């Protein structure tokens, strides 16, 4: 009898295996169901094996149903099946069931394998649950799951995406302390995150040992992030030195490397160096892309007549398929700066005829130009078009309008735009605050400017050198010298210096007030 039962059980298992092999999963489910409801005993092995099949086939609802049927029988999954189940559920983001499985594993004294652990961490970070990801990470470590370099990299990436720069650096340090060696992906996560947060010096310092020792073969992604970071910080010599070092160690600069340098050179009018980089690209066999040509167009717009720039776009860029919204926006801004708003608007219409999707930058240039000319009706029409297209004004747009209104003496309207910006959950930066503070000070409304200055500090938007200069200038004009001196002290505490002419004016005004007294 025992042999007969065993033979029947083996026959069921064989039928299920053959059906699975043939891709007939629904039929396999029917046979497994038949087996479960027969008089022949089904073992934990059978449940583990079949749930594993269902997970592999992404039949998660069936796998869940069978799992809950299995539990009251006193059966459990083995750690491997639990881990595969959790990994699969991460694809469909079924957090409730994942939590239940993790809880069951903890009760049984199991921990997920490193693959499931990392997949779950990655899901939490991608779903903006980075705080819970960190908590889960340390909880698993306490239970004996040793994280690998992938685990740390996932957390570092997630923390940087969430803007938690200090926490990301601490996770990196924890990785080093634990003896886990960083690889290229870990270094890239750290460097890209820090450079994005404008902390290029810290980024370089933290991977300098890997760069010098060549323990890790760093990719162009790491070097490009550092080069871009140094360029943004205005330290081109450091960027160029890194680019030279790349070539020496056999990590050849790529198109991104050259484009980053080109962008800096053209922005800073370093035309000879830009030409040298272009020549080097040709020698290296690197083909220019749309970004490269847009940098060239930007260069032409700085030194040539706008019409020549337009000809360059039509003759050199358009035949290569490199003429895009960036190209047109660059030209529109150039014609607007040259007070040729009609030509700029014709280019705008040309874009529409070609079916190009305009962006906020395009509209910002035109709206600013028409406002400058006093043509508010066209500016309003363009703003309405923006809204219809679903283009939300960004910080640059609002700041541009703010600056124009303040310079035109329309400070009350500017205040309205500033409040509208906040209502739309766009956080003003130092440039936005400076535009309004400057306008208020020029209008003799220094008390309101001071209030805005204090509000700025309360919002953790650090006043820069210009902010202090505007406030001090307004206080001097309002003959509030005592307050001006206090702000000057704050300015010096921040490491900023006052222009010689402003400091002289402040001292002279003080002397004059003393003499009158």
Swiss-Prot record:
Chief location of this protein within or outside the cell: mitochondrion
GO CC annotations on file: mitochondrion; plant-type vacuole
Gene3D superfamilies in UniProt: Tetratricopeptide repeat domain
Alphabetical UniProt keywords: Mitochondrion, Repeat, Transit peptide
PPR repeat windows: 8-42, 43-77, 78-112, 113-147, 148-182, 183-218, 219-253, 254-288, 289-320, 324-358, 359-393, 394-428, 429-463, 464-498
Targeting presequence: 1-57
Subcellular locations according to the entry: Mitochondrion
Membrane-spanning intervals of the chain: none
Xref: PROSITE patterns: PPR
Pfam families listed in its UniProt record: PPR, PPR_2
Similarity comment: family membership: Belongs to the PPR family. P subfamily.
NCBIfam families assigned: PPR (TIGR00756)
UniProt-recorded name of the protein: Pentatricopeptide repeat-containing protein At1g13040, mitochondrial
Source organism per UniProt: Arabidopsis thaliana
């Amino acid at each position: 009898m025992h042999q007969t039962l065993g033979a029947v059980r083996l026959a069921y298992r064989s039928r299920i295996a053959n059906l699975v092999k043939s891709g007939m999963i629904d039929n396999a489910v029917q046979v497994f169901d038949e087996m479960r409801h027969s008089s022949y005993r089904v073992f934990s092995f059978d449940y583990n094996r079949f749930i594993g099949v269902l997970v592999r086939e992404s039949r998660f609802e069936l796998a869940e149903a069978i799992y809950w049927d299995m539990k009251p029988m006193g059966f459990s999954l083995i750690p491997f099946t639990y881990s595969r189940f959790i990994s699969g559920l991460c694809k469909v983001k079924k957090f409730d069931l994942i939590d239940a499985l993790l809880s069951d594993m903890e009760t049984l004294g199991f921990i997920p394998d490193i693959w499931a652990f990392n997949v779950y961490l990655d899901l939490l970070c991608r779903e903006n649950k980075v705080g819970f990801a960190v908590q889960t990470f340390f909880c698993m470590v306490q239970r004996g799951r040793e994280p690998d370099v992938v685990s740390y990299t996932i957390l570092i990436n997630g923390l940087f995406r969430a803007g938690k720069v200090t926490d990301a650096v601490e996770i990196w340090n924890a990785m080093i302390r634990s003896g886990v060696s960083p690889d290229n992906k870990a270094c890239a996560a750290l460097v890209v995150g820090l450079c994005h947060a404008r902390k290029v010096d810290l980024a370089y310092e933290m991977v300098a040992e890997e760069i010098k020792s060549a323990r890790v073969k760093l990719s162009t992604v790491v070097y490009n992030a550092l080069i871009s970071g140094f360029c943004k910080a205005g330290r081109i010599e450091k960027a160029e030195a890194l680019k030279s070092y790349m070539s020496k160690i056999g990590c050849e600069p790529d198109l991104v490397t050259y484009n980053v340098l080109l962008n800096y050179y053209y922005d800073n009018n370093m035309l000879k160096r830009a030409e040298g980089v272009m020549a080097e690209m040709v020698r290296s066999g690197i083909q220019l892309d749309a970004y490269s040509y847009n940098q060239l167009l930007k260069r032409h717009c700085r030194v040539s007549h706008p019409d020549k720039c337009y000809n360059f776009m039509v003759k050199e860029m358009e035949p290569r398929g490199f003429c895009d919204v960036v190209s047109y926006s660059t030209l529109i801004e150039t014609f607007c700066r040259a007070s040729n708003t009609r030509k700029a608007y014709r280019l705008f219409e040309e874009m529409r005829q070609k079916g190009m999707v305009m962006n906020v930058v395009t509209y910002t240039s035109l709206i600013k130009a028409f406002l400058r000319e006093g043509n508010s009706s066209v500016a309003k029409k363009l703003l309405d078009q923006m809204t219809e297209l679903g283009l939300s004004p960004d910080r640059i747009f609002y700041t541009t309008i703010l600056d124009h209104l303040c310079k035109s003496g329309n400070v009350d309207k500017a205040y309205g735009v500033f409040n509208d910006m906040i209502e739309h959950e766009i956080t003003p930066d130092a440039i936005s605050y400076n535009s309004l503070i400057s306008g208020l000070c020029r209008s003799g409304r220094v008390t309101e400017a001071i209030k805005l200055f204090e509000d700025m500090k309360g919002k953790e938007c650090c006043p820069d050198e210009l902010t202090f200069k505007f406030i001090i200038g307004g206080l001097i004009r309002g003959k509030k010298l005592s307050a001006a001196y206090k702000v000057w002290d704050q300015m010096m505490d921040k490491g900023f210096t006052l222009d010689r002419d402003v400091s002289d004016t402040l001292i002279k005004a003080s002397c004059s007030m003393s003499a009158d007294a």
